[in-house]
């Protein structure tokens, strides 16, 4: 059998098959244009954007890495508040008596005795020449005439006070000492008619002259010891003998 008579038939079959594929593809595009693509597959596109962060996961277990080196010490912090006082400790034992060089105590005692003897001699000289002693008081005058304020300042300068008799014996001692009228440490400057000593205490002994005190002239706030031993009120601005008393 000859092959040539079959050639037209073969060509016709191929055309028919090609037409069939074309029609089928076109029909498919008309029916599902968005689904079926008859062309060859395209290349991959670019990666899309990252999605949103997911929820935080649970804390994982510590890793197995090596422990790092210890860091340097931090800065010194501020001092804390003082703590409460501790309880007292036990009482210590009595210490041994101290030692002093030999002869010091006996030397001090002898010096003290010599000083006391010398002071006693000086008192006697003063008493004999210028002053009078009664009990534990020593009355002394320098013979100067001055106002009451100056008498107070003079006595304070020598750590004494203006003579203030507390009894008849002291009043007599001052009387025997003076040759002129002398100020006493008594005034009524704060309250008229209420005579007190220079410390503000009321008097427990007085020896007023007859008719005294009379506050003549309304400014007689100081007191004089007269030569007869009695008292008289006078102005403090007048000048009279200064007599001081020293405690002994």
From Swiss-Prot:
Annotated region described as Disordered, given as residue ranges: 43-113
Residues recorded as bearing Hydroxyproline in the entry: 47, 73, 79, 82, 88
GO (cellular component) term, any one: external side of plasma membrane
Tissue/organ expression: Plasma protein produced mainly in the liver.
Effect of mutating residue 52 to C: In 0.05% of European and African populations
Protein name as it appears in the record: Mannose-binding protein C
Coiled coil: 112-130
PROSITE patterns: C_TYPE_LECTIN_1, C_TYPE_LECTIN_2
Pfam family, one: Lectin_C
Signal sequence coordinates: 1-20
Ranges of compositional bias, category Pro residues: 75-87
Domain Collagen-like residue range list: 42-99
Disulfide-linked positions: 155-244, 222-236
Residues passing through the membrane, by range: none
Organism: Homo sapiens (Human)
GO biological process, one term: complement activation, lectin pathway
Subunit structure: Oligomeric complex of 3 or more homotrimers. Interacts with MASP1 and MASP2. Interacts with MEP1A and MEP1B and may inhibit their catalytic activity. Interacts with CR1 (via Sushi 24 and Sushi 25 domains).
Protein location: Secreted
Gene3D superfamilies in UniProt: Mannose-Binding Protein A, subunit A
Domain C-type lectin span(s) in chain numbering: 134-245
Free-text note on domains in this protein's UniProt record: The coiled-coil domain mediates trimerization.
Annotated GO MF terms: calcium-dependent protein binding; D-mannose binding; identical protein binding; signaling receptor binding
Role of this protein: Calcium-dependent lectin involved in innate immune defense. Binds mannose, fucose and N-acetylglucosamine on different microorganisms and activates the lectin complement pathway. Binds to late apoptotic cells, as well as to apoptotic blebs and to necrotic cells, but not to early apoptotic cells, facilitating their uptake by macrophages. May bind DNA. Upon SARS coronavirus-2/SARS-CoV-2 infection, activates the complement lectin pathway which leads to the inhibition SARS-CoV-2 infection and a reduction of the induced inflammatory response.
Keyword line: Calcium, Coiled coil, Collagen, Complement activation lectin pathway, Complement pathway, Disulfide bond, Hydroxylation, Immunity, Innate immunity, Lectin, Mannose-binding, Repeat, Secreted, Signal
Bias (Basic and acidic residues) ranges: 49-61, 93-102
């Amino acid at each position: 059998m000859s092959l040539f008579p079959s050639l037209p038939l073969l060509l016709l079959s191929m055309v028919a098959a090609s037409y069939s594929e074309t029609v089928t593809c076109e029909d498919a595009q008309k029916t599902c244009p968005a689904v079926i693509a008859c062309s060859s597959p395209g290349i991959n596109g670019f990666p899309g954007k990252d999605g949103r962060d997911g929820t935080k996961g649970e804390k994982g277990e510590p890793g197995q890495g090596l422990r790092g080196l210890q860091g340097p010490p931090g800065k010194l912090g501020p001092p804390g508040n003082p703590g409460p006082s501790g309880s007292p400790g036990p009482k210590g034992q009595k210490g041994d008596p101290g030692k002093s060089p030999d002869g010091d105590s006996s030397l001090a005692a002898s010096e003290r005795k010599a000083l006391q003897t010398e002071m006693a001699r000086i008192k006697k000289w003063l008493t004999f020449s210028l002053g009078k002693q009664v009990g534990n008081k020593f009355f002394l005058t320098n013979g100067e005439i001055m106002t009451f304020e100056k008498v107070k300042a003079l006595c304070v300068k020598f750590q004494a006070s203006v003579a203030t008799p507390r009894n008849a014996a002291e009043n007599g001692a001052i009387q025997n000492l003076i040759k002129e009228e002398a100020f006493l440490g008594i005034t009524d400057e704060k309250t008229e008619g209420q005579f007190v000593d220079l410390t503000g205490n009321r008097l427990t002994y007085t020896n007023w002259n007859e008719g005294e005190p009379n506050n003549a002239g309304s400014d007689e706030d100081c007191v004089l010891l007269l030569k007869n031993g009695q008292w008289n009120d006078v102005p403090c601005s007048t000048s009279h003998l200064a007599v001081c008393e020293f405690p002994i």
